[in-house]
């Protein structure tokens, strides 16, 4: 007579099953949360985030905190083993170079070597006798050595003597650990920083400033063929004087500048383009790496490459055509509507090393500078 009697055990069984399923769901959520938290703490950074870790094993507590530092950005002590080319340079705070950036204590006082978190070694200043000019071989625990050069492989001697000494590379090469190009283009918008190009002030055609002549070099041989068809004003040693104080004023009178590199290597695009040509508002005529290499750093219509012409005579004819066609000549300046050139400074390069060291604590050894750089 009791219709509910047989249904009671079934109701209890369903209730137990629901409880077990709920506990299982809670467990799955908990372990999923635990794994995500663990991955965020020790794994690769998620897209859009930067993993910032303190340098482990830094010597003698040199990561002291100051008013600009935070736990994520320790204030490191960086030693310049020599001034670049033995010439002292100003060392402003890195936060002054890039507002809001972290700071390091950067010094050329070799007495701080035992406390330094990192040592920057400028290759040119040690290359003639590396064994005698390098820092002491017994380095403090965790100290990182940075190999630094803005010269091309053709002008870097005794690279093989540096095997196993360094932890990071720093150069104009884009595949360096710390990339320090001679120049770059910075996007901008709004009113032009410079007044529009005054074409009437461009009273001369082609200039070239060269300090190391090298009669057998590719650039001198090309110039000698070019000047047979086109007048080129040459400045520098054994040529017209070009005082540093009036250099930009002089070069800005020219429509074109021969930005010919002293040696041909990937990414080796120097101040000859970034300062001598672009800062003078002259169209650079380049001889260096390939056009495609230049186009990694410049719009294709910002320069003229010698490889675009079958001969120096053809290049001369093209420059003479542009001299008479103002519209075509001015087309080489359109990129300046949205971009502006910037040139390197030693201080900014040292700050780039500071920021790299703060962001990456990984300790590595560069087995062979020579194998990588040449």
Curated annotation (Swiss-Prot):
PANTHER family xref list: 4-GALACTOSYL-N-ACETYLGLUCOSAMINIDE 3-ALPHA-L-FUCOSYLTRANSFERASE FUT5 (PTHR11929:SF11), ALPHA- 1,3 -FUCOSYLTRANSFERASE (PTHR11929)
Function: Catalyzes preferentially the transfer of L-fucose, from a guanosine diphosphate-beta-L-fucose, to the N-acetyl-beta-D-glucosamine (GlcNAc) of an N-acetyllactosamine unit (type 2 chain) of an oligosaccharide, or a glycoprotein- and a glycolipid-linked N-acetyllactosamine unit via an alpha (1,3) linkage and participates in the surface expression of VIM-2, Lewis X/SSEA-1 and sialyl Lewis X antigens. Preferentially transfers fucose to the GlcNAc of an internal N-acetyllactosamine unit of a poly-N-acetyllactosamine chain acceptor substrate.
Subcellular location: Golgi apparatus, Golgi stack membrane
Cytoplasmic topological segments: 1-15
InterPro entries for the chain: Glyco_tran_10_C, Glyco_tran_10_N, Glyco_trans_10, GT10-like_C_sf
Enzyme Commission number, as recorded: 2.4.1.152, 2.4.1.65
UniProt superkingdom: Eukaryota
GO terms, biological process: ceramide metabolic process; fucosylation; oligosaccharide metabolic process; protein N-linked glycosylation; protein O-linked glycosylation
Catalyses which reaction(s): a beta-D-galactosyl-(1->3)-N-acetyl-beta-D-glucosaminyl derivative + GDP-beta-L-fucose = a beta-D-galactosyl-(1->3)-[alpha-L-fucosyl-(1->4)]-N-acetyl-beta-D-glucosaminyl derivative + GDP + H(+); an N-acetyl-alpha-neuraminyl-(2->3)-beta-D-galactosyl-(1->4)-N-acetyl-beta-D-glucosaminyl derivative + GDP-beta-L-fucose = an alpha-Neu5Ac-(2->3)-beta-D-Gal-(1->4)-[alpha-L-Fuc-(1->3)]-beta-D-GlcNAc derivative + GDP + H(+); an alpha-Neu5Ac-(2->3)-beta-D-Gal-(1->4)-beta-D-GlcNAc-(1->3)-beta-D-Gal-(1->4)-[alpha-L-Fuc-(1->3)]-beta-D-GlcNAc derivative + GDP-beta-L-fucose = an alpha-Neu5Ac-(2->3)-beta-D-Gal-(1->4)-[alpha-L-Fuc-(1->3)]-beta-D-GlcNAc-(1->3)-beta-D-Gal-(1->4)-[alpha-L-Fuc-(1->3)]-beta-D-GlcNAc derivative + GDP + H(+); a beta-D-galactosyl-(1->4)-N-acetyl-beta-D-glucosaminyl derivative + GDP-beta-L-fucose = a beta-D-galactosyl-(1->4)-[alpha-L-fucosyl-(1->3)]-N-acetyl-beta-D-glucosaminyl derivative + GDP + H(+)
Annotated protein name in UniProt: 4-galactosyl-N-acetylglucosaminide 3-alpha-L-fucosyltransferase FUT5
Topology feature Lumenal, residues: 35-374
This protein's record includes keyword Transmembrane: yes
Source organism: Pan troglodytes
Keywords: Glycoprotein, Glycosyltransferase, Golgi apparatus, Lipid metabolism, Membrane, Signal-anchor, Transferase, Transmembrane, Transmembrane helix
One Pfam family named in its UniProt record: Glyco_transf_10
Lipid bilayer topology: Single-pass type II membrane protein
GO molecular function: 3-galactosyl-N-acetylglucosaminide 4-alpha-L-fucosyltransferase activity; 4-galactosyl-N-acetylglucosaminide 3-alpha-L-fucosyltransferase activity; alpha-(1->3)-fucosyltransferase activity
Transmembrane segments: 16-34
Pathway: Protein modification; protein glycosylation
Sites carrying sugar chains: 60, 105, 167, 198
Record lineage: Eukaryota, Metazoa, Chordata, Craniata, Vertebrata
Family, per entry: Belongs to the glycosyltransferase 10 family.
GO cellular component, one term: Golgi cisterna membrane
């Amino acid at each position: 007579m009791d219709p509910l009697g047989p249904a009671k055990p079934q109701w209890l069984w369903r209730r137990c099953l629901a409880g077990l399923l709920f506990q299982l769901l809670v467990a799955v959520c908990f372990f999923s949360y635990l794994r995500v938290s663990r991955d965020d703490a020790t794994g690769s950074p998620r897209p859009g985030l930067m993993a910032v870790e303190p340098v482990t094993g830094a010597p003698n507590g040199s990561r002291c905190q100051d008013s600009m530092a935070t736990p994520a950005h320790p204030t490191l002590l960086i030693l310049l083993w020599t001034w670049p080319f033995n010439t002292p340079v100003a060392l402003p705070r890195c936060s002054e170079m890039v507002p809001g950036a972290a700071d390091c204590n950067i010094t050329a006082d070799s007495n701080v070597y035992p406390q330094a978190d990192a040592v920057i070694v400028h290759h040119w200043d040690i290359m003639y006798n590396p064994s005698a000019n390098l820092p002491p071989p017994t380095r403090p625990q965790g100290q990182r050595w940075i190999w630094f050069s803005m010269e091309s492989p053709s002008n870097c001697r005794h690279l093989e003597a540096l095997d196993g000494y360094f932890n990071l590379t720093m150069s104009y090469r884009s595949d360096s650990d710390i990339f320090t190009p001679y120049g770059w283009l910075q996007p901008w918008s709004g009113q032009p920083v410079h007044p529009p190009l005054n074409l009437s002030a461009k009273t001369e055609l082609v200039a070239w400033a060269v300090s190391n002549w090298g009669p057998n070099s590719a650039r001198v041989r090309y110039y000698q063929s070019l000047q047979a068809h086109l007048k080129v004003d040459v400045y520098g040693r054994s040529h017209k004087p070009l005082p540093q104080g009036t250099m930009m004023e002089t070069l800005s009178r020219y429509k074109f500048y021969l930005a010919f590199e002293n040696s041909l290597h990937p990414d080796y695009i120097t101040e000859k383009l970034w300062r001598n040509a672009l800062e003078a508002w002259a169209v650079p005529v380049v001889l260096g790496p390939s056009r495609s290499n230049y186009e990694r750093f410049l719009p294709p219509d910002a320069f003229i490459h010698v490889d675009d012409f079958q001969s120096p005579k053809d290049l001369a004819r093209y420059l003479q055509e542009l001299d008479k066609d103002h519209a075509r000549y001015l087309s080489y300046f359109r990129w300046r509507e949205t971009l502006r050139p910037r040139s390197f400074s030693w201080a900014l390069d040292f700050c780039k090393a500071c920021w790299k060291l703060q962001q990456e604590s990984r300790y590595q050894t560069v087995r062979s500078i020579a194998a990588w750089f040449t």
